[in-house]
Amino acid sequence: MNIIAQLEAEQCAKIAEKRQLPAFQVGDTVRVMVRVTEGTRTRVQAYEGVCIARSGYGFNENFTVRKISYGEGVERVFPFYSPLIEGVELVRRGKVRRAKLYYLRALRGKAARIAEKRDYRKKNVQIVEEEVAPAVEANVETTTAE
């Protein structure tokens, strides 16, 4: 391992200690919390959209998020280990078969939606068994009206 790769690995480990990013992939809808500085004030702004690409590896890894804002498509590239990213929340998983979803740029409206991935194996389904109460036999006297 050369010195540059070693320094990058140390920086990745240092940033990973501060915040834990979820394991998301292309097609997932994510909410990225970005620290924005306006003048002297700093605030955290949420940017929610579909992850359409991941590129690079190690310290140079990036991901691209696309959202529709007021009818216009907006894409933003985030460095994975940027100190300006406060965190990433996974909103929903998407079912895609491509590594890059650049074809979404040409689609409009409902055609640009991505189907949700449903993983039935990981879902904890608890079957609640009804406890059958012991049947109580009531002694009912039958009378006949004459």
UniProtKB/Swiss-Prot annotation:
Tell me which GO cellular component terms the UniProt record holds. cytosolic large ribosomal subunit
Q: Does the keyword Ribosomal protein apply?
A: yes
Q: Which GO terms describe its biological process?
A: translation
Per its UniProt record, what Gene3D superfamilies does this chain match? 2.30.30.790
Q: Which UniProt keywords apply?
A: Ribonucleoprotein, Ribosomal protein
Coiled-coil annotated residue ranges, if any: none
Q: Which SUPFAM superfamilies match?
A: Translation proteins SH3-like domain
Q: Which InterPro entries match?
A: Ribosomal_bL19 (IPR001857), Ribosomal_bL19_CS (IPR018257), Ribosomal_bL19_sf (IPR038657), Translation_prot_SH3-like_sf (IPR008991)
Pfam families the UniProt entry points to? Ribosomal_L19
Family listed: Belongs to the bacterial ribosomal protein bL19 family.
Q: What does this protein do?
A: This protein is located at the 30S-50S ribosomal subunit interface and may play a role in the structure and function of the aminoacyl-tRNA binding site.
Q: Which NCBIfam families match?
A: rplS_bact (TIGR01024)
Protein name listed in UniProt: Large ribosomal subunit protein bL19
What species was this sequence derived from? Answer: Bartonella bacilliformis (strain ATCC 35685 / KC583 / Herrer 020/F12,63)
